[in-house]
Protein backbone atom coordinates (compact mmCIF):
# COMPACT_ATOMS: atom_id res chain seq x y z
CA UNK A 1 0.00 0.00 0.00
CA UNK A 2 1.39 3.41 -0.97
CA UNK A 3 2.21 5.79 1.85
CA UNK A 4 -0.60 8.28 2.43
CA UNK A 5 0.16 11.91 1.68
CA UNK A 6 -0.37 14.22 4.63
CA UNK A 7 -2.58 17.13 3.61
CA UNK A 8 -1.96 20.50 5.19
CA UNK A 9 -4.49 23.18 5.99
CA UNK A 10 -7.40 23.19 8.38
CA UNK A 11 -10.66 22.09 6.79
CA UNK A 12 -8.72 20.76 3.75
CA UNK A 13 -8.43 24.33 2.49
CA UNK A 14 -6.68 24.44 -0.86
CA UNK A 15 -6.70 20.66 -1.32
CA UNK A 16 -8.06 19.03 -4.47
CA UNK A 17 -10.33 16.19 -3.32
CA UNK A 18 -11.61 15.00 -6.68
CA UNK A 19 -12.67 15.97 -10.18
CA UNK A 20 -15.91 17.49 -11.45
CA UNK A 21 -17.28 18.72 -14.76
CA UNK A 22 -20.14 20.57 -13.10
CA UNK A 23 -18.76 23.93 -12.00
CA UNK A 24 -15.73 26.14 -11.56
CA UNK A 25 -15.48 28.30 -8.47
CA UNK A 26 -13.12 31.21 -7.92
CA UNK A 27 -10.96 30.93 -11.00
CA UNK A 28 -8.78 34.04 -11.35
CA UNK A 29 -10.04 35.17 -7.95
CA UNK A 30 -13.69 35.39 -8.98
CA UNK A 31 -16.07 33.69 -11.34
CA UNK A 32 -18.57 30.86 -11.14
CA UNK A 33 -19.61 28.70 -14.07
CA UNK A 34 -22.09 25.85 -14.41
CA UNK A 35 -20.91 23.39 -17.09
CA UNK A 36 -19.02 26.28 -18.71
CA UNK A 37 -21.75 28.93 -18.52
CA UNK A 38 -21.13 32.07 -16.44
CA UNK A 39 -23.63 32.17 -13.58
CA UNK A 40 -24.22 35.88 -14.19
CA UNK A 41 -25.39 35.18 -17.73
CA UNK A 42 -27.62 32.35 -16.52
CA UNK A 43 -29.12 34.55 -13.80
CA UNK A 44 -29.80 37.31 -16.33
CA UNK A 45 -31.33 35.25 -19.12
CA UNK A 46 -32.24 31.70 -18.02
CA UNK A 47 -35.04 30.07 -16.09
CA UNK A 48 -34.11 27.99 -13.05
CA UNK A 49 -35.64 24.96 -14.75
CA UNK A 50 -33.16 25.45 -17.63
CA UNK A 51 -30.27 25.50 -15.16
CA UNK A 52 -31.58 22.42 -13.35
CA UNK A 53 -31.77 20.63 -16.70
CA UNK A 54 -28.25 21.77 -17.54
CA UNK A 55 -26.81 20.40 -14.31
CA UNK A 56 -28.80 17.17 -14.27
CA UNK A 57 -28.86 16.31 -17.97
CA UNK A 58 -25.59 17.86 -19.16
CA UNK A 59 -26.71 20.51 -21.66
CA UNK A 60 -29.14 23.41 -21.84
CA UNK A 61 -32.53 22.24 -23.08
CA UNK A 62 -34.12 23.17 -26.37
CA UNK A 63 -37.43 25.02 -26.25
CA UNK A 64 -39.32 21.74 -26.65
CA UNK A 65 -37.19 19.97 -24.05
CA UNK A 66 -37.71 22.79 -21.55
CA UNK A 67 -41.47 22.74 -22.09
CA UNK A 68 -41.57 18.97 -21.57
CA UNK A 69 -39.34 19.17 -18.49
CA UNK A 70 -41.36 21.98 -16.89
CA UNK A 71 -44.56 20.05 -17.55
CA UNK A 72 -43.07 16.96 -15.94
CA UNK A 73 -42.05 18.88 -12.83
CA UNK A 74 -45.49 20.49 -12.56
CA UNK A 75 -47.14 17.06 -12.52
CA UNK A 76 -44.85 15.92 -9.68
CA UNK A 77 -45.65 18.72 -7.21
CA UNK A 78 -48.29 17.12 -5.01
CA UNK A 79 -47.37 15.24 -1.83
CA UNK A 80 -48.60 11.79 -0.79
CA UNK A 81 -51.17 11.87 1.99
CA UNK A 82 -48.87 9.83 4.22
CA UNK A 83 -46.16 12.49 3.93
CA UNK A 84 -48.64 15.27 4.68
CA UNK A 85 -49.64 13.42 7.86
CA UNK A 86 -45.99 13.18 8.91
CA UNK A 87 -45.46 16.90 8.28
CA UNK A 88 -48.54 17.72 10.36
CA UNK A 89 -46.94 15.97 13.34
CA UNK A 90 -43.82 18.15 13.26
CA UNK A 91 -44.14 21.07 15.73
CA UNK A 92 -43.90 24.72 14.73
CA UNK A 93 -40.69 25.20 16.72
CA UNK A 94 -38.86 22.42 14.89
CA UNK A 95 -35.79 23.41 12.91
CA UNK A 96 -36.95 23.85 9.29
CA UNK A 97 -33.91 21.96 8.04
CA UNK A 98 -35.01 18.99 10.13
CA UNK A 99 -38.36 19.26 8.38
CA UNK A 100 -36.64 19.10 5.00
CA UNK A 101 -34.52 16.10 5.95
CA UNK A 102 -37.53 14.31 7.42
CA UNK A 103 -39.59 15.00 4.32
CA UNK A 104 -36.83 13.79 2.02
CA UNK A 105 -36.15 10.66 4.03
CA UNK A 106 -39.83 9.75 4.40
CA UNK A 107 -40.48 10.21 0.69
CA UNK A 108 -37.64 7.75 0.14
CA UNK A 109 -39.54 5.21 2.21
CA UNK A 110 -42.73 5.39 0.16
CA UNK A 111 -41.22 6.18 -3.27
CA UNK A 112 -37.81 4.46 -3.08
CA UNK A 113 -35.05 4.65 -5.67
CA UNK A 114 -35.21 1.00 -6.72
CA UNK A 115 -32.04 1.22 -8.80
CA UNK A 116 -29.73 3.88 -10.19
CA UNK A 117 -31.47 3.88 -13.59
CA UNK A 118 -34.24 6.05 -12.09
CA UNK A 119 -31.92 8.57 -10.39
CA UNK A 120 -33.02 11.46 -12.61
CA UNK A 121 -36.69 10.68 -12.05
CA UNK A 122 -36.13 10.64 -8.29
CA UNK A 123 -34.31 13.97 -8.49
CA UNK A 124 -37.10 15.51 -10.54
CA UNK A 125 -39.61 14.30 -7.96
CA UNK A 126 -37.65 15.90 -5.12
CA UNK A 127 -37.17 19.11 -7.10
CA UNK A 128 -40.92 19.34 -7.62
CA UNK A 129 -41.86 18.30 -4.08
CA UNK A 130 -39.42 20.24 -1.89
CA UNK A 131 -41.30 23.59 -2.03
CA UNK A 132 -44.48 21.83 -0.92
CA UNK A 133 -42.70 19.94 1.87
CA UNK A 134 -41.44 23.23 3.28
CA UNK A 135 -44.64 25.21 2.83
CA UNK A 136 -47.13 22.51 3.84
CA UNK A 137 -45.37 22.11 7.19
CA UNK A 138 -44.97 25.85 7.68
CA UNK A 139 -48.55 26.80 6.82
CA UNK A 140 -50.04 23.96 8.90
CA UNK A 141 -47.82 24.40 11.97
CA UNK A 142 -47.94 28.22 11.99
CA UNK A 143 -51.34 29.03 10.46
CA UNK A 144 -53.30 25.82 11.03
CA UNK A 145 -54.01 25.54 7.28
CA UNK A 146 -53.84 22.45 5.10
CA UNK A 147 -52.78 23.99 1.82
CA UNK A 148 -53.22 22.60 -1.67
CA UNK A 149 -49.73 21.56 -2.78
CA UNK A 150 -50.50 22.12 -6.46
CA UNK A 151 -50.54 25.55 -8.12
CA UNK A 152 -50.73 26.65 -11.74
CA UNK A 153 -47.51 28.67 -11.45
CA UNK A 154 -45.20 27.73 -14.33
CA UNK A 155 -41.94 28.16 -12.39
CA UNK A 156 -40.61 26.52 -9.24
CA UNK A 157 -39.87 29.93 -7.74
CA UNK A 158 -43.38 31.19 -8.42
CA UNK A 159 -44.84 27.94 -7.14
CA UNK A 160 -42.96 28.29 -3.84
CA UNK A 161 -44.09 31.89 -3.31
CA UNK A 162 -47.70 30.97 -4.13
CA UNK A 163 -47.66 28.09 -1.63
CA UNK A 164 -46.12 30.29 1.06
CA UNK A 165 -48.38 33.33 0.65
CA UNK A 166 -51.51 31.68 -0.71
CA UNK A 167 -51.65 33.92 -3.77
CA UNK A 168 -50.01 34.47 -7.12
CA UNK A 169 -46.66 36.28 -6.73
CA UNK A 170 -45.85 39.49 -8.53
CA UNK A 171 -43.77 39.31 -11.69
CA UNK A 172 -40.84 40.94 -9.87
CA UNK A 173 -40.95 38.52 -6.95
CA UNK A 174 -41.13 35.51 -9.25
CA UNK A 175 -38.15 36.84 -11.20
CA UNK A 176 -36.06 37.39 -8.07
CA UNK A 177 -36.84 33.88 -6.80
CA UNK A 178 -35.81 32.49 -10.17
CA UNK A 179 -32.51 34.37 -9.97
CA UNK A 180 -31.93 33.24 -6.38
CA UNK A 181 -32.50 29.58 -7.21
CA UNK A 182 -30.03 29.85 -10.08
CA UNK A 183 -27.36 31.50 -7.92
CA UNK A 184 -27.57 28.81 -5.23
CA UNK A 185 -27.86 25.79 -7.58
CA UNK A 186 -24.28 24.52 -7.57
CA UNK A 187 -20.94 25.39 -5.97
CA UNK A 188 -18.39 22.63 -6.46
CA UNK A 189 -17.03 20.71 -3.41
CA UNK A 190 -18.61 22.69 -0.57
CA UNK A 191 -19.28 20.82 2.68
CA UNK A 192 -22.80 19.59 1.87
CA UNK A 193 -21.91 18.58 -1.68
CA UNK A 194 -18.86 16.67 -0.51
CA UNK A 195 -21.05 15.00 2.11
CA UNK A 196 -23.40 13.89 -0.66
CA UNK A 197 -20.49 12.52 -2.68
CA UNK A 198 -19.06 10.61 0.28
CA UNK A 199 -22.48 9.06 0.85
CA UNK A 200 -22.84 8.29 -2.86
CA UNK A 201 -19.43 6.63 -2.91
CA UNK A 202 -20.81 3.89 -0.65
CA UNK A 203 -23.47 3.25 -3.35
CA UNK A 204 -26.22 4.43 -1.03
CA UNK A 205 -29.56 5.54 -2.47
CA UNK A 206 -30.20 9.08 -3.67
CA UNK A 207 -32.57 9.98 -0.84
CA UNK A 208 -29.86 9.09 1.71
CA UNK A 209 -27.30 11.19 -0.17
CA UNK A 210 -29.60 14.22 -0.25
CA UNK A 211 -30.65 13.77 3.39
CA UNK A 212 -26.97 13.63 4.38
CA UNK A 213 -26.31 16.82 2.42
CA UNK A 214 -29.23 18.57 4.14
CA UNK A 215 -27.75 17.57 7.50
CA UNK A 216 -24.44 19.13 6.52
CA UNK A 217 -26.09 22.32 5.28
CA UNK A 218 -27.97 22.58 8.58
CA UNK A 219 -24.75 23.54 10.37
CA UNK A 220 -24.32 27.30 10.95
CA UNK A 221 -20.87 27.40 9.36
CA UNK A 222 -22.34 26.28 6.03
CA UNK A 223 -26.04 27.06 5.72
CA UNK A 224 -27.80 29.69 7.75
CA UNK A 225 -25.51 32.61 6.92
CA UNK A 226 -28.34 34.53 5.27
CA UNK A 227 -30.51 33.96 8.34
CA UNK A 228 -27.73 35.21 10.62
CA UNK A 229 -27.19 38.20 8.33
CA UNK A 230 -30.88 39.07 8.51
CA UNK A 231 -30.88 38.88 12.29
CA UNK A 232 -27.88 41.24 12.40
CA UNK A 233 -29.32 43.71 9.86
CA UNK A 234 -32.58 43.96 11.79
CA UNK A 235 -30.73 45.13 14.91
CA UNK A 236 -30.04 48.53 13.37
CA UNK A 237 -32.51 51.30 12.59
CA UNK A 238 -30.21 53.52 10.50
CA UNK A 239 -27.07 53.39 8.39
CA UNK A 240 -25.10 55.32 11.02
CA UNK A 241 -26.21 52.95 13.75
CA UNK A 242 -25.17 50.04 11.52
CA UNK A 243 -21.70 51.52 11.02
CA UNK A 244 -21.21 52.03 14.75
CA UNK A 245 -22.61 48.60 15.56
CA UNK A 246 -20.42 46.85 13.01
CA UNK A 247 -17.32 48.62 14.31
CA UNK A 248 -18.25 47.48 17.80
CA UNK A 249 -18.69 43.89 16.65
CA UNK A 250 -15.31 43.97 14.95
CA UNK A 251 -13.68 45.39 18.07
CA UNK A 252 -15.22 42.60 20.15
CA UNK A 253 -14.18 40.09 17.48
CA UNK A 254 -17.77 38.95 17.06
CA UNK A 255 -18.54 36.63 14.15
CA UNK A 256 -20.15 38.60 11.31
CA UNK A 257 -21.93 36.28 8.89
CA UNK A 258 -22.28 36.86 5.18
CA UNK A 259 -18.75 38.13 4.47
CA UNK A 260 -15.67 36.57 2.93
CA UNK A 261 -15.39 33.18 1.28
CA UNK A 262 -13.18 30.11 1.47
CA UNK A 263 -12.53 30.11 -2.30
CA UNK A 264 -13.28 33.56 -3.73
CA UNK A 265 -10.45 36.03 -3.17
CA UNK A 266 -11.70 39.27 -4.71
CA UNK A 267 -15.50 39.10 -4.82
CA UNK A 268 -18.42 36.69 -4.96
CA UNK A 269 -20.01 36.98 -8.41
CA UNK A 270 -23.37 35.93 -7.00
CA UNK A 271 -23.39 38.90 -4.65
CA UNK A 272 -23.31 41.56 -7.35
CA UNK A 273 -26.35 39.91 -8.96
CA UNK A 274 -28.54 39.51 -5.89
CA UNK A 275 -27.55 42.94 -4.51
CA UNK A 276 -29.00 44.57 -7.61
CA UNK A 277 -32.26 42.67 -7.23
CA UNK A 278 -32.43 43.47 -3.52
CA UNK A 279 -32.18 47.16 -4.42
CA UNK A 280 -35.06 46.81 -6.89
CA UNK A 281 -37.18 45.13 -4.22
CA UNK A 282 -36.27 47.85 -1.72
CA UNK A 283 -37.35 50.53 -4.18
CA UNK A 284 -40.60 48.68 -4.83
CA UNK A 285 -41.63 48.70 -1.16
CA UNK A 286 -40.22 52.16 -0.41
CA UNK A 287 -37.63 50.82 2.01
CA UNK A 288 -35.50 53.48 3.68
CA UNK A 289 -33.85 51.36 6.36
CA UNK A 290 -33.04 47.74 5.54
CA UNK A 291 -31.10 48.24 2.32
CA UNK A 292 -29.19 51.34 3.54
CA UNK A 293 -28.28 49.41 6.70
CA UNK A 294 -27.06 46.50 4.57
CA UNK A 295 -24.93 48.81 2.44
CA UNK A 296 -23.49 50.49 5.54
CA UNK A 297 -22.42 47.14 6.98
CA UNK A 298 -21.03 46.13 3.57
CA UNK A 299 -18.97 49.35 3.28
CA UNK A 300 -17.68 49.12 6.86
CA UNK A 301 -16.56 45.51 6.46
CA UNK A 302 -14.62 46.41 3.32
CA UNK A 303 -13.03 49.52 4.80
CA UNK A 304 -12.03 47.81 8.04
CA UNK A 305 -11.27 44.23 6.99
CA UNK A 306 -11.25 44.16 3.17
CA UNK A 307 -13.97 41.52 3.39
CA UNK A 308 -16.57 41.43 0.64
CA UNK A 309 -20.16 40.21 1.01
CA UNK A 310 -20.84 36.71 -0.24
CA UNK A 311 -24.04 35.43 -1.85
CA UNK A 312 -25.82 35.14 1.48
CA UNK A 313 -25.63 38.75 2.66
CA UNK A 314 -27.96 40.55 0.22
CA UNK A 315 -30.09 37.44 -0.13
CA UNK A 316 -31.23 38.20 3.41
CA UNK A 317 -32.83 41.53 2.52
CA UNK A 318 -34.10 40.23 -0.83
CA UNK A 319 -35.98 37.39 0.85
CA UNK A 320 -37.26 39.72 3.57
CA UNK A 321 -38.69 42.14 1.00
CA UNK A 322 -40.61 39.24 -0.54
CA UNK A 323 -42.21 38.40 2.81
CA UNK A 324 -40.29 35.18 3.35
CA UNK A 325 -39.86 34.27 7.05
CA UNK A 326 -36.22 34.25 8.11
CA UNK A 327 -36.42 30.65 9.32
CA UNK A 328 -37.17 29.51 5.74
CA UNK A 329 -34.10 31.11 4.15
CA UNK A 330 -31.92 27.99 4.35
CA UNK A 331 -34.65 25.55 3.23
CA UNK A 332 -34.91 27.63 0.04
CA UNK A 333 -31.20 26.91 -0.41
CA UNK A 334 -32.11 23.20 -0.27
CA UNK A 335 -34.72 23.59 -3.03
CA UNK A 336 -32.02 25.07 -5.24
CA UNK A 337 -28.86 23.17 -4.27
CA UNK A 338 -30.66 19.85 -4.69
CA UNK A 339 -29.79 20.17 -8.37
CA UNK A 340 -26.08 20.46 -7.67
CA UNK A 341 -26.12 17.74 -5.02
CA UNK A 342 -27.88 15.28 -7.29
CA UNK A 343 -25.62 16.08 -10.25
CA UNK A 344 -22.60 15.36 -8.05
CA UNK A 345 -24.15 12.07 -6.95
CA UNK A 346 -24.62 11.13 -10.61
CA UNK A 347 -21.01 12.08 -11.31
CA UNK A 348 -19.71 10.10 -8.34
CA UNK A 349 -21.71 7.02 -9.32
CA UNK A 350 -20.47 7.17 -12.92
CA UNK A 351 -16.83 6.80 -11.88
CA UNK A 352 -17.00 5.51 -8.36
CA UNK A 353 -14.49 4.51 -5.77
CA UNK A 354 -15.42 4.68 -2.12
CA UNK A 355 -14.10 7.84 -0.49
CA UNK A 356 -11.96 6.65 2.40
CA UNK A 357 -9.04 8.92 3.32
CA UNK A 358 -6.52 8.17 6.05
CA UNK A 359 -5.99 10.11 9.26
CA UNK A 360 -2.78 11.30 10.84
CA UNK A 361 -2.75 9.82 14.34
CA UNK A 362 -1.80 12.35 17.05
CA UNK A 363 -2.74 10.34 20.16
CA UNK A 364 -0.61 8.58 22.79
CA UNK A 365 1.97 5.95 21.86
CA UNK A 366 1.05 2.27 21.96
CA UNK A 367 0.71 1.02 25.54
CA UNK A 368 -0.08 -2.18 27.37
CA UNK A 369 -3.57 -2.89 28.67
CA UNK A 370 -3.88 -2.83 32.48
CA UNK A 371 -6.62 -5.01 34.05
CA UNK A 372 -9.23 -3.05 35.99
CA UNK A 373 -8.14 -4.55 39.32
CA UNK A 374 -4.73 -2.89 38.94
CA UNK A 375 -5.90 0.58 37.81
Feature roles, as predicted:
Residues 1-375:
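Non-transmembrane, aqueous-exposed alpha-helical and coiled segments at domain scale
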Amino acid sequence: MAEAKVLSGAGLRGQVAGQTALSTVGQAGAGLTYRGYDVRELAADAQFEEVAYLLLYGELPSKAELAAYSAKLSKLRDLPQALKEVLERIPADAHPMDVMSTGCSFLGNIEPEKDFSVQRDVTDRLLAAFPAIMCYWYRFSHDGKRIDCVTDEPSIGGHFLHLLHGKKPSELHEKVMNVSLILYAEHEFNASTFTARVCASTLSDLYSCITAAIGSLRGPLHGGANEAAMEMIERFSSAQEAIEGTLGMLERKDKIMGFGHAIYKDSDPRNEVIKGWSKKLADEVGDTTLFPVSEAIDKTMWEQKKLFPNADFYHASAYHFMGIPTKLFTPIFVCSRLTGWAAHVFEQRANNRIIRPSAEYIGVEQRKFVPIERR
